[in-house]
Amino acid sequence: MSYFFNPEARVEHLEHVAYYESRQSGLGARYLAAFDAAMVKVCEAPHRYGVEFPPDIRRYRVPGFPYNILYRQVGADIEVLVIAPHRRRPGYWLGRL
């Protein structure tokens, strides 16, 4: 199983990488590694993680970083809807659906 980004989620993801890299050299790469490891787990067993927004939007926390990946299965793939900061209002991204 593979994954793809909602266009707005891709922009957010790249902003997170740039932010961490601007804070400390190599921190952006650590964020990317944590995100990639999270997506490996999601792609291996997408239904293992809890439904955040019914009927099918699930959540997985990026280990070591204050973000949740919200995703859904679309056919044989995973759509990353948002990489949501823990401090941001829940559901701010629902207009993307």
Which ranges hold each PLM region?
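Basic/aromatic recognition patch in beta-strand/loop cores that engages polyanionic ligands
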Residues: 37, 44-77
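Arg/Lys-rich, positively charged N-terminal/basic patches that mediate binding to nucleic acids
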Residues: 1-32
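Residue-level recognition of specific faces of alpha-helices
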Residues: 16, 34, 38-41, 59, ...
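Short, flexible helix/strand-to-coil boundary loops that buttress conserved ligand/catalytic motifs
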Residues: 17, 46, 53, 82-84, ...
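N-terminal processing/targeting junctions
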Residues: 11-13, 41, 73
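Enriched for short, Lys/Arg-rich terminal
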Residues: 29, 68, 72-97
